[in-house]
Amino acid sequence: MNRAERRAEFVYEAARLENTAAHRPINPEPWGQRDPAFRRNMIQAVARQCGRNRLTSPAALHADWVRAYRTMGWRYGSSRNVQAKTHPDMVPLSRLGRKEQEKDWVFFMLCEIAKRIT
């Protein structure tokens, strides 16, 4: 596993733990159970956030996440369904509830921590 992969898995799994602790309604599958396209996208997103071209706000990160999910064939749905590729968070960040908005802040800060992973 290279540094980019280690960083992405760290951010993803730490975010999952925080989701559980915060009792958020959606907590996705463990890293190893996600499909390869998702893992590639996450590796790229975390690598960007750990580099010079990082996005500077959780709102920008969320918009980027929505674009990436659309590219992978996902669409808005009232519930998260992996088989149907629907997700209720595929809306602008401002339309999400506080708990769901906090996920983007958590991801943003976890990427700052991940920069230290060598």
Where do the model's predicted regions map?
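Alpha-helical propensity feature that highlights long, continuous alpha-helices across diverse contexts
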Residues: 1-118
